[in-house]
Regions:
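Nucleotide and nucleotide-moiety/phosphate-recognizing core
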Residues: 1-158, 164-179, 187-190, 194-205
Length: 209
């Protein structure tokens, strides 16, 4: 069974001059379109999590929700939002795929490799890793961790994904650097323009409404 997914679009990026960086163009498409093209064939359903105006996201035909817990508590709040949404929408679902909104080169076998790492390393959570380090916002999470995550976020500031997953067995799935390249600054975007994202059919155009 393919997992549901949440794209962590978060909020505005000050290092990119404000605004939602997921709409920045790369190879004639916004970053979020590249991510949807990669993730849609690998998942059963996709949620976009953002605390910005939802209107610009609606054109992509996916549900859009803000953080379930107010206070801008970072990616963990978005992950919790995805878990709660997935449990309601897919009661039999076991895992949730999480991806950041600024990684346009995600591979077509992202989910398969995360599942492989999860099984082989007998872990609770699987996250992506490259020679540059780990990428904990790109991973597979058991949706039944929602109650614990919600409790921890409500009890005190646990803003670091690395900090929170320290209490679990975590598997790392290895990828090439370019597969997980993320765009945080104008220089990052300029560097990524020297690479071409895979030429994928825009599967999200026929995705769930």
């Amino acid at each position: 069974m393919r997992p549901a997914a949440v794209i962590l679009a978060g909020g505005r990026s000050s290092r990119m001059g404000g605004g939602d960086k997921c709409f920045l163009p790369l190879a004639d498409k916004p970053l979020i379109a590249h991510i949807l093209d990669a993730v849609t064939p690998q998942t059963s359903d996709i949620l976009i999590n953002t605390n910005s105006d939802p209107a610009p996201f609606l054109k992509y035909g996916q549900p859009v929700l803000p953080d379930a817990i107010p206070g801008f508590q970072g990616p963990l709040a978005g992950i919790l939002t995805g878990m709660l949404w997935s449990r309601k929408r897919h009661p039999r679902g076991v895992h949730l795929l999480t991806v950041a909104s600024d990684v346009p080169f995600l591979p077509d076998d992202l989910v398969a490799r995360l599942y492989h790492a999860l099984r082989e390393q007998r872990a609770d959570i699987a996250i992506a890793s490259s020679p540059e380090g780990t990428h904990p916002t790109i991973g597979l999470w058991p949706v039944d961790l929602a109650q614990r995550l919600e409790h921890d976020l409500m009890e005190g500031p646990v803003r670091s994904v690395h900090q929170w997953i320290g209490g679990f067995r975590v598997a790392c799935a290895e990828f090439e650097t370019i597969a997980l390249a993320n765009i945080n600054t104008p220089a990052d975007l300029a560097a990524c323009r020297h690479h071409h994202p895979p030429d994928r059919r825009p599967a999200w155009l026929t995705g769930p409404m």
